[in-house]
Amino acid sequence: MKFSGSHILSVEQFERADIERIFAVADSMEPYALRQKVTRVLEGAILGNMFFEPSTRTRVSFGCAFNLLGGEVRETTGFKSSAIAKGESLYDTARVLSGYSDVICMRHPQEGSVAEFAQASRVPVINGGDGANEHPSQALLDLYTIQKELRDKGRSLDGLRIAMIGDLKHGRTVHSLMRLLGLFANLQVVLVSPEELAMPEEYVELLRGLGHRVDVSSDLANSIGHVDIVYSTRIQEERFGSKEEADLYRGRFRLNQAIYTQFCEPNTVIMHPLPRDSRSDANELDNDLNQNPNLAIFRQTDNGILVRMALFALILDVADQVDKFSRPVNWYHSRTF
Protein backbone atom coordinates (compact mmCIF):
# COMPACT_ATOMS: atom_id res chain seq x y z
CA MET A 1 0.00 0.00 0.00
CA LYS A 2 0.98 3.65 -0.28
CA PHE A 3 1.52 4.77 3.30
CA SER A 4 2.06 8.49 2.76
CA GLY A 5 -1.13 10.37 3.63
CA SER A 6 -3.17 7.19 4.09
CA HIS A 7 -5.74 6.34 6.76
CA ILE A 8 -5.11 3.21 8.84
CA LEU A 9 -8.63 1.87 9.43
CA SER A 10 -8.42 -1.90 9.03
CA VAL A 11 -5.78 -4.58 8.79
CA GLU A 12 -7.44 -5.58 5.52
CA GLN A 13 -5.44 -2.74 3.96
CA PHE A 14 -2.16 -4.60 4.42
CA GLU A 15 -0.28 -7.10 2.30
CA ARG A 16 2.60 -9.10 3.74
CA ALA A 17 5.14 -6.68 2.24
CA ASP A 18 3.42 -3.80 4.06
CA ILE A 19 3.72 -5.62 7.38
CA GLU A 20 7.40 -6.26 6.76
CA ARG A 21 7.92 -2.57 5.93
CA ILE A 22 6.18 -1.44 9.13
CA PHE A 23 8.22 -3.86 11.22
CA ALA A 24 11.51 -2.78 9.62
CA VAL A 25 10.74 0.85 10.43
CA ALA A 26 9.67 -0.17 13.95
CA ASP A 27 13.06 -1.85 14.47
CA SER A 28 14.77 1.41 13.50
CA MET A 29 12.85 3.30 16.20
CA GLU A 30 14.47 1.43 19.12
CA PRO A 31 17.17 4.05 19.90
CA TYR A 32 14.46 6.70 20.29
CA ALA A 33 12.09 4.54 22.33
CA LEU A 34 15.02 3.55 24.55
CA ARG A 35 15.85 7.26 25.01
CA GLN A 36 19.32 6.80 23.54
CA LYS A 37 18.62 9.45 20.89
CA VAL A 38 16.14 12.27 20.36
CA THR A 39 14.65 13.21 17.00
CA ARG A 40 12.74 16.35 16.03
CA VAL A 41 11.59 15.06 12.65
CA LEU A 42 7.94 15.88 13.43
CA GLU A 43 8.64 19.19 15.16
CA GLY A 44 5.60 21.43 14.68
CA ALA A 45 3.27 18.55 13.78
CA ILE A 46 0.15 17.95 15.88
CA LEU A 47 -1.57 14.67 16.71
CA GLY A 48 -5.27 14.89 17.53
CA ASN A 49 -5.92 12.08 20.03
CA MET A 50 -9.70 11.52 20.16
CA PHE A 51 -10.83 8.80 22.56
CA PHE A 52 -14.55 8.38 23.15
CA GLU A 53 -14.07 5.11 25.06
CA PRO A 54 -11.86 4.55 28.12
CA SER A 55 -8.22 3.94 27.25
CA THR A 56 -4.89 4.09 29.02
CA ARG A 57 -2.34 2.13 27.00
CA THR A 58 -3.54 2.94 23.48
CA ARG A 59 -4.14 6.64 24.11
CA VAL A 60 -0.90 7.23 26.02
CA SER A 61 1.10 5.00 23.67
CA PHE A 62 0.01 6.92 20.57
CA GLY A 63 0.75 10.21 22.30
CA CYS A 64 4.15 9.03 23.52
CA ALA A 65 5.05 7.69 20.07
CA PHE A 66 4.24 11.05 18.48
CA ASN A 67 6.15 12.97 21.16
CA LEU A 68 9.21 10.76 20.64
CA LEU A 69 9.22 11.82 16.98
CA GLY A 70 9.18 15.47 18.04
CA GLY A 71 5.47 16.19 17.58
CA GLU A 72 2.85 17.63 19.91
CA VAL A 73 -0.39 16.01 21.12
CA ARG A 74 -3.85 17.47 21.71
CA GLU A 75 -6.41 15.21 23.38
CA THR A 76 -10.19 14.86 23.58
CA THR A 77 -11.46 12.15 25.92
CA GLY A 78 -15.06 11.07 26.47
CA PHE A 79 -18.29 12.29 24.92
CA LYS A 80 -19.11 14.73 27.72
CA SER A 81 -16.09 16.91 26.98
CA SER A 82 -16.74 17.04 23.21
CA ALA A 83 -19.22 18.87 20.98
CA ILE A 84 -20.68 15.46 20.08
CA ALA A 85 -22.50 15.70 23.43
CA LYS A 86 -24.26 18.76 21.98
CA GLY A 87 -25.39 16.83 18.92
CA GLU A 88 -22.49 17.55 16.55
CA SER A 89 -22.12 14.94 13.80
CA LEU A 90 -18.99 12.92 13.14
CA TYR A 91 -18.77 14.72 9.79
CA ASP A 92 -18.65 18.16 11.39
CA THR A 93 -16.26 16.99 14.10
CA ALA A 94 -13.92 15.55 11.47
CA ARG A 95 -13.98 18.69 9.34
CA VAL A 96 -13.17 20.89 12.31
CA LEU A 97 -10.55 18.82 14.12
CA SER A 98 -8.70 17.84 10.96
CA GLY A 99 -8.10 21.55 10.53
CA TYR A 100 -6.30 21.58 13.87
CA SER A 101 -4.19 18.44 13.39
CA ASP A 102 -1.75 16.77 11.01
CA VAL A 103 -2.91 13.26 11.89
CA ILE A 104 -5.73 11.96 14.11
CA CYS A 105 -6.04 8.81 16.22
CA MET A 106 -9.63 7.98 17.13
CA ARG A 107 -11.40 5.44 19.33
CA HIS A 108 -15.20 5.18 19.30
CA PRO A 109 -17.67 2.60 20.67
CA GLN A 110 -19.66 2.33 17.44
CA GLU A 111 -18.46 -0.11 14.76
CA GLY A 112 -17.58 1.69 11.52
CA SER A 113 -17.54 5.10 13.20
CA VAL A 114 -13.83 5.75 12.65
CA ALA A 115 -14.15 4.98 8.93
CA GLU A 116 -17.12 7.37 8.75
CA PHE A 117 -15.06 10.04 10.50
CA ALA A 118 -12.13 9.46 8.14
CA GLN A 119 -14.29 10.12 5.08
CA ALA A 120 -14.72 13.72 6.22
CA SER A 121 -11.22 14.24 7.61
CA ARG A 122 -8.68 16.33 5.74
CA VAL A 123 -5.74 14.52 7.38
CA PRO A 124 -4.84 10.84 7.92
CA VAL A 125 -6.86 8.99 10.56
CA ILE A 126 -5.74 5.92 12.55
CA ASN A 127 -8.37 3.61 14.00
CA GLY A 128 -7.66 3.24 17.72
CA GLY A 129 -10.56 0.80 18.08
CA ASP A 130 -14.16 0.97 16.83
CA GLY A 131 -16.49 -1.01 19.08
CA ALA A 132 -16.01 -4.76 18.76
CA ASN A 133 -14.89 -4.40 15.14
CA GLU A 134 -11.14 -3.78 14.74
CA HIS A 135 -8.02 -2.44 16.45
CA PRO A 136 -5.37 -2.45 13.70
CA SER A 137 -2.45 -0.94 15.61
CA GLN A 138 -2.93 -3.45 18.45
CA ALA A 139 -2.90 -6.32 15.96
CA LEU A 140 0.27 -4.93 14.41
CA LEU A 141 2.07 -4.64 17.74
CA ASP A 142 0.86 -8.11 18.73
CA LEU A 143 2.19 -9.59 15.51
CA TYR A 144 5.43 -7.63 15.88
CA THR A 145 5.81 -9.04 19.39
CA ILE A 146 5.15 -12.58 18.18
CA GLN A 147 7.77 -12.12 15.45
CA LYS A 148 10.37 -10.86 17.94
CA GLU A 149 9.64 -13.63 20.45
CA LEU A 150 9.92 -16.30 17.73
CA ARG A 151 13.01 -14.69 16.20
CA ASP A 152 14.80 -15.01 19.54
CA LYS A 153 14.12 -18.75 19.28
CA GLY A 154 15.28 -19.00 15.65
CA ARG A 155 11.73 -19.18 14.29
CA SER A 156 9.57 -17.10 11.95
CA LEU A 157 5.87 -16.28 11.73
CA ASP A 158 5.38 -18.98 9.11
CA GLY A 159 4.42 -22.19 10.89
CA LEU A 160 3.18 -20.36 14.00
CA ARG A 161 1.10 -22.32 16.53
CA ILE A 162 -1.15 -20.05 18.59
CA ALA A 163 -4.02 -20.46 21.05
CA MET A 164 -6.42 -17.53 21.53
CA ILE A 165 -8.38 -17.69 24.76
CA GLY A 166 -11.33 -15.91 26.34
CA ASP A 167 -13.91 -13.51 24.92
CA LEU A 168 -13.26 -14.01 21.23
CA LYS A 169 -16.67 -12.71 20.19
CA HIS A 170 -16.27 -9.16 21.46
CA GLY A 171 -12.47 -8.86 21.45
CA ARG A 172 -11.56 -6.57 18.56
CA THR A 173 -7.85 -7.27 19.07
CA VAL A 174 -8.24 -10.94 18.14
CA HIS A 175 -10.45 -10.08 15.16
CA SER A 176 -7.73 -7.88 13.68
CA LEU A 177 -4.99 -10.35 14.62
CA MET A 178 -6.80 -13.21 12.85
CA ARG A 179 -6.85 -11.20 9.63
CA LEU A 180 -3.15 -10.37 9.87
CA LEU A 181 -2.19 -13.96 10.60
CA GLY A 182 -3.80 -14.96 7.33
CA LEU A 183 -0.92 -13.27 5.49
CA PHE A 184 1.51 -15.93 6.70
CA ALA A 185 1.90 -19.66 5.95
CA ASN A 186 1.11 -23.00 7.62
CA LEU A 187 -0.55 -21.70 10.77
CA GLN A 188 -2.16 -23.77 13.51
CA VAL A 189 -4.74 -21.77 15.46
CA VAL A 190 -6.75 -22.99 18.46
CA LEU A 191 -9.71 -20.83 19.54
CA VAL A 192 -10.66 -21.46 23.17
CA SER A 193 -13.83 -19.89 24.57
CA PRO A 194 -17.33 -20.61 25.81
CA GLU A 195 -19.62 -21.30 22.87
CA GLU A 196 -21.47 -18.04 23.57
CA LEU A 197 -18.23 -16.05 23.22
CA ALA A 198 -16.79 -17.88 20.22
CA MET A 199 -14.79 -16.22 17.47
CA PRO A 200 -17.17 -14.95 14.75
CA GLU A 201 -17.39 -17.52 11.97
CA GLU A 202 -16.16 -15.11 9.29
CA TYR A 203 -12.68 -15.08 10.85
CA VAL A 204 -12.60 -18.86 11.27
CA GLU A 205 -13.59 -19.39 7.65
CA LEU A 206 -11.11 -16.76 6.47
CA LEU A 207 -8.13 -18.67 7.86
CA ARG A 208 -9.47 -22.07 6.88
CA GLY A 209 -10.06 -20.77 3.37
CA LEU A 210 -6.40 -19.76 3.21
CA GLY A 211 -5.35 -23.31 4.08
CA HIS A 212 -4.59 -22.86 7.78
CA ARG A 213 -5.65 -25.28 10.49
CA VAL A 214 -8.20 -23.77 12.88
CA ASP A 215 -9.57 -25.77 15.82
CA VAL A 216 -12.37 -24.59 18.11
CA SER A 217 -12.48 -25.75 21.73
CA SER A 218 -13.85 -24.97 25.18
CA ASP A 219 -11.17 -27.06 26.93
CA LEU A 220 -8.26 -24.91 28.09
CA ALA A 221 -5.97 -27.68 29.36
CA ASN A 222 -6.09 -29.69 26.14
CA SER A 223 -5.64 -26.62 23.93
CA ILE A 224 -2.44 -25.03 25.24
CA GLY A 225 -0.09 -28.00 25.27
CA HIS A 226 1.51 -27.69 21.85
CA VAL A 227 1.51 -24.01 20.92
CA ASP A 228 4.16 -21.30 20.61
CA ILE A 229 1.89 -18.50 21.83
CA VAL A 230 -0.98 -18.34 24.31
CA TYR A 231 -2.92 -15.13 23.65
CA SER A 232 -5.37 -14.47 26.47
CA THR A 233 -8.13 -11.85 26.43
CA ARG A 234 -10.38 -10.31 29.06
CA ILE A 235 -14.15 -10.53 29.29
CA GLN A 236 -15.33 -7.39 27.47
CA GLU A 237 -17.76 -6.35 30.19
CA GLU A 238 -18.68 -3.13 28.37
CA ARG A 239 -20.08 -5.17 25.44
CA PHE A 240 -22.54 -7.08 27.65
CA GLY A 241 -26.02 -6.02 28.66
CA SER A 242 -25.07 -6.07 32.34
CA LYS A 243 -22.22 -6.83 34.73
CA GLU A 244 -24.19 -9.85 35.93
CA GLU A 245 -24.22 -11.29 32.41
CA ALA A 246 -20.46 -10.76 32.04
CA ASP A 247 -19.88 -12.35 35.45
CA LEU A 248 -21.28 -15.64 34.14
CA TYR A 249 -18.05 -16.14 32.17
CA ARG A 250 -15.39 -14.90 34.59
CA GLY A 251 -12.81 -17.41 35.74
CA ARG A 252 -13.63 -19.99 33.07
CA PHE A 253 -10.23 -19.82 31.37
CA ARG A 254 -7.90 -18.40 33.99
CA LEU A 255 -4.22 -19.17 33.38
CA ASN A 256 -1.85 -19.33 36.35
CA GLN A 257 1.67 -20.67 36.88
CA ALA A 258 0.48 -24.12 38.00
CA ILE A 259 -1.62 -24.58 34.86
CA TYR A 260 1.21 -23.23 32.71
CA THR A 261 3.73 -25.64 34.25
CA GLN A 262 1.41 -28.61 33.92
CA PHE A 263 0.12 -28.11 30.39
CA CYS A 264 2.34 -25.70 28.40
CA GLU A 265 5.66 -26.33 26.71
CA PRO A 266 8.56 -24.70 28.62
CA ASN A 267 9.07 -21.91 26.07
CA THR A 268 5.42 -21.08 25.36
CA VAL A 269 5.03 -17.29 25.24
CA ILE A 270 2.11 -15.71 27.11
CA MET A 271 0.49 -12.61 25.63
CA HIS A 272 -2.47 -10.37 26.46
CA PRO A 273 -3.58 -7.05 24.91
CA LEU A 274 -4.18 -5.53 28.39
CA PRO A 275 -5.69 -4.40 30.60
CA ARG A 276 -5.87 -7.73 32.39
CA ASP A 277 -8.41 -8.12 35.16
CA SER A 278 -6.38 -9.25 38.18
CA ARG A 279 -9.34 -9.84 40.48
CA SER A 280 -9.47 -13.33 41.95
CA ASP A 281 -12.63 -14.26 40.04
CA ALA A 282 -11.50 -12.94 36.66
CA ASN A 283 -10.92 -14.69 33.39
CA GLU A 284 -7.32 -14.02 32.56
CA LEU A 285 -3.70 -14.18 33.67
CA ASP A 286 -2.85 -14.70 37.32
CA ASN A 287 -0.35 -12.40 39.01
CA ASP A 288 1.75 -15.45 39.91
CA LEU A 289 2.87 -15.43 36.26
CA ASN A 290 4.58 -12.07 36.69
CA GLN A 291 8.03 -13.62 37.23
CA ASN A 292 7.66 -16.08 34.35
CA PRO A 293 10.23 -15.00 31.72
CA ASN A 294 7.83 -16.10 28.98
CA LEU A 295 5.21 -13.57 30.07
CA ALA A 296 5.47 -11.05 27.23
CA ILE A 297 2.66 -8.65 28.12
CA PHE A 298 4.95 -5.79 29.06
CA ARG A 299 7.20 -6.41 26.08
CA GLN A 300 3.99 -6.03 24.05
CA THR A 301 3.31 -2.58 25.47
CA ASP A 302 6.91 -1.51 24.84
CA ASN A 303 6.65 -2.78 21.27
CA GLY A 304 3.49 -0.73 20.83
CA ILE A 305 5.57 2.44 21.00
CA LEU A 306 7.85 1.19 18.21
CA VAL A 307 4.99 0.16 15.93
CA ARG A 308 3.04 3.38 16.45
CA MET A 309 6.15 5.46 15.83
CA ALA A 310 6.59 3.51 12.60
CA LEU A 311 3.00 4.18 11.54
CA PHE A 312 3.37 7.92 12.12
CA ALA A 313 6.71 8.02 10.30
CA LEU A 314 5.27 6.17 7.30
CA ILE A 315 1.96 8.03 7.13
CA LEU A 316 3.67 11.43 7.40
CA ASP A 317 6.43 10.30 5.01
CA VAL A 318 9.43 10.89 7.27
CA ALA A 319 10.60 7.31 7.85
CA ASP A 320 13.83 7.97 5.96
CA GLN A 321 14.51 11.30 7.68
CA VAL A 322 14.27 10.41 11.36
CA ASP A 323 18.03 10.08 11.88
CA LYS A 324 18.75 13.36 10.06
CA PHE A 325 16.99 15.26 12.84
CA SER A 326 18.44 13.30 15.76
CA ARG A 327 20.98 13.84 18.53
CA PRO A 328 22.07 11.89 21.64
CA VAL A 329 20.05 12.50 24.80
CA ASN A 330 21.60 14.60 27.57
CA TRP A 331 19.79 13.06 30.56
CA TYR A 332 20.17 9.77 32.41
CA HIS A 333 18.53 6.85 30.65
CA SER A 334 18.53 3.13 31.37
CA ARG A 335 15.91 1.18 29.47
CA THR A 336 15.65 -2.26 27.89
CA PHE A 337 13.05 -4.16 25.92
From Swiss-Prot:
A GO biological process held by the record: 'de novo' UMP biosynthetic process
Keywords: Pyrimidine biosynthesis, Transferase
Pathway listed: Pyrimidine metabolism; UMP biosynthesis via de novo pathway; (S)-dihydroorotate from bicarbonate: step 2/3
Enzyme class: transferase
Residues involved in carbamoyl phosphate binding: R57, T58, R107, H135, Q138, L274, P275
A GO CC term attached to the entry: cytosol
E.C. code: 2.1.3.2
Enzymatic reactions: carbamoyl phosphate + L-aspartate = N-carbamoyl-L-aspartate + phosphate + H(+)
Pfam families for this protein: OTCace (PF00185), OTCace_N (PF02729)
GO molecular function ontology, one term from the record: amino acid binding
HAMAP family: Asp_carb_tr
UniProt record similarity statement: Belongs to the aspartate/ornithine carbamoyltransferase superfamily. ATCase family.
Functional description taken from the UniProt entry: Catalyzes the condensation of carbamoyl phosphate and aspartate to form carbamoyl aspartate and inorganic phosphate, the committed step in the de novo pyrimidine nucleotide biosynthesis pathway.
Name of this protein: Aspartate carbamoyltransferase catalytic subunit
Gene behind the chain: pyrB
